[in-house]
Amino acid sequence: MPTTLSSSSGRAAGANDRVQIGFIGFGLIGHQHVHDFKNQPDVDIVALSDCYEPRMRQGVAMCGPQAKGYSDFRRLLDDKNVQAVVVSTPDHWHALITILACQAGKDVYVEKPMTLFVREGRWMANAANRYHRVIQVGTQQRSGIHYQHAKKLMRNGYIGHIHTVRLASFRNIMPGFGRPADCAPPPGMNYDMWLGPAPKRPYNPHRSLYHFRWFWDYSGGQMTNLGDHELDILHWVMGVEGPGAASSDGGRLALTDDNGETPDTQDALFEYPGFTALWSHREASRGRGAGAGLEFFGTKGSLFITRSGFQVFPDTKIPPQNQVPQFSGMPVGGPTHVADFTPEPWTPAMKIERSNDLLAAHARNFLDCVKSRREPIAPVEGGHRVATTSHLANISLRLGRKIKWNPATETIEGDPEASSWLERPYRAPWDRELR
């Protein structure tokens, strides 16, 4: 996406204009977004769509008396009063709704993970460019002031040359959510619309209304859900577009008494030029709290960061020969310890607390870019590259082998079977929307 976008294909917002927002999807994060945008001083919430009528009514009530409710998001996109949309649907709808919104002349704030499969990301970026639309991806950590501070420090060499990054999310949801039987959809739910481009399946309470993340038809599991937040910061700080290789292992190893499919345990190793990154998630063990956020390891120490803040842990300057173990002296010719030296840190220690509401700041950045036509802080191209990285890990896990990736050509090298996983078919009639 270019730095500044033309506004020729849609109604431009002047510097003092209000922005008319429509919401598509009113689940957990959709509720949060209505709250955040409603509290912005220059927003009019004019519409909300959800294919589950009770949620649609609840969302419209939260939006206010001026908001219209739509059970079909396409009617919201037809509404000329809607200038921009916030997409908070399950993952399998993100790309198609975003592309159709761009075609309708709407700017888009779309939740992460941006895509369900790799090729969707390029389709979305192409739509943004073709229709001159602003797309903000919901990787809100970029809008945290302490994340921006940490990025600046690391870019300026505060912890030295970064060679390793660890990323993680650990929690314990044992014994899981059970195995409800297939049944009829709840009253007021258009299940066929909820499925949209996804395969036709019998309704199950776990296939919708939050639990969709445990099924490959609609999500990449916690690798794409939580992993995208942390990988996004890694890409942003390190200035990379993707790994050269990804390998992953894990599975549904602990939550075996429910009907979920995606891994409760997963490790993924990403090989980038000059450094490696390791993602780990656990759904059945929090342990000592080691599984959270990111830690960047450099030659002067490490920087650990979460949404609560960050801390620099400096290494101590110790002569290398003093780090060789000795047992009652060293044999002749071996390293000799330096007897007279003063240990000192390679870099100053630092601890910074969170200082702003990053979700509200992310909404604010999107609105400012709708008006200015500038590229937002979390643009579509970056969202595509991050989601691709997570998808590569899942392809590796499901095929049981390392995936070699060329970020420049966006192709998997030397593996036709893995390459076939870069795209999934859309169910009719939604498959015709992109033709």
Indicate residue ranges for each PLM-predicted region:
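N-terminal Rossmann-like dinucleotide-binding module
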Residues: 2-63, 141-144, 234
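Residues forming the Rossmann-fold NAD(P)(H) cofactor-binding site
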Residues: 31, 95, 228
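Glycine-centered tight turns that cap/initiate beta-strands
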Residues: 42, 81, 158-161, 242
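N-terminal Rossmann-like NAD(P) cofactor-binding module of classical short-chain dehydrogenase/reductase
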Residues: 84-86
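Conserved SAM-binding strand-loop segment of SAM-dependent methyltransferases
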Residues: 67-72
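Beta-strand-loop-alpha-helix segment that lines the small-molecule cofactor/substrate pocket
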Residues: 90-91, 95-143, 157
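Contiguous beta-strand/loop segments that form the cofactor/metal-binding neighborhood of enzyme cores
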Residues: 148-149, 161, 166-221, 225-381, ...
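Nucleotide donor/acceptor-binding cores
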Residues: 17-19, 133, 163
